[in-house]
Amino acid sequence: MKKIQVLLKPQCNAEIQNQFATKFGDQCEFTFQGKETEDAIVAAEVVIGEPEEEEILKAENLRWIQLTWVGVDKYTKMKAFPTGVTLTNASGAFGKIISEYVIGNIIALYRELPNYWKNKQKHLWVQNRSSETIYGKNILILGTGDIGRNIAHRMKAFETHVTGIKRTAVPEHLQQMKEFDEVYDLTALDQQLQKADIVIGCLPGTPETKGLLNYERLYSMKKDAILVNVGRGSLIPTEDLIRVLEEGHLKGTVLDVFETEPLPETSPLWNMENVLITPHIAGPSFGGNAEVQDMIWNICMENLERYLNGKKLKNIVRLKDGY
């Protein structure tokens, strides 16, 4: 029986290579990172990782791409993604670690930890007794996928009221997902923004979500609300956010993603004390966290097993929808 050609783009150690070979070696022939050749790309029926557009177009036998991250912007922007090629992502690997990032940074803002970090550098013992708590707050989560559900689940430990916003219409049986108290579609966004103490963006990047949190919507939020974005930078127009913050609106902002990355050195956001900035690391992939890395490989192996057995793959991306 002719073996299926599988190209693995990410760097993987000998242990992972052995796992693939032991589990699938009878049916697959693997080409690992660092050993790619023009012939291997052309022959590949399956690619695990993030191939470049020119590689996809060269892969004459390509049937399936398994991404090792969640975002698919790179492929939705392709002029002509090949018909007959299935794209799947690694949804399910990042929800836990991103939820910890979100909650940790909200607590940092509420307890004014950045000010204490600055005082530490100056050896200053200054007590600020004003502090906030997540307990009992109204939480609005934009996006009810793996990341949104994980954030909602952990927010419930603080006895919060958690509302979810889905991009698409909400079927009746989903209007109360177990992690959320309420779930609505985008038509309810304006009303829900006004109620929320904390707004968390984890929506995919699509034409419909681009610029969704514009100046008017940001300013409609409570003056002392906290805004977090761990989804896509296109959700929030940077200039609109800067304007709102300069006008003294919002208690603070946690930003891991931006319209332009890297964030330009000249951006006023860098100098705002109530803005916490990280360089798109809320959900670290390979080399960032061993548990996340294991979950990514488990997703890849489970889907490869499904592919070989003719079963439906998990995490199929709908390119026309952008996620």
Question: PLM ranges: what are they?
Answer:
Residues 1-46:
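N-terminal glycine-/charge-rich "phosphate-binding" loop or analogous flexible N-terminal tail
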Residues 42-120, 131-132:
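Phosphate/diphosphate ligand-binding glycine-rich loop within oxidoreductases
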Residues 51, 69, 203, 230-231, ...:
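Glycine-rich, N-terminal phosphate-binding loop of Rossmann-like dinucleotide-binding domains
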Residues 99-115, 157-160, 297-306:
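Oxidoreductase and adenylate-handling cofactor-binding alpha/beta cores
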Residues 116-150, 178:
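Glycine-rich NAD(P)-binding loop of Rossmann-like domains
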Residues 163:
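Conserved beta-strand positions in the Rossmann-like core of class I SAM-dependent methyltransferases
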Residues 169-268:
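Rossmann-like adenosine-cofactor binding region
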Residues 224, 230-323:
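Rossmann-like dinucleotide-binding domain for NAD(H)/NADP(H)
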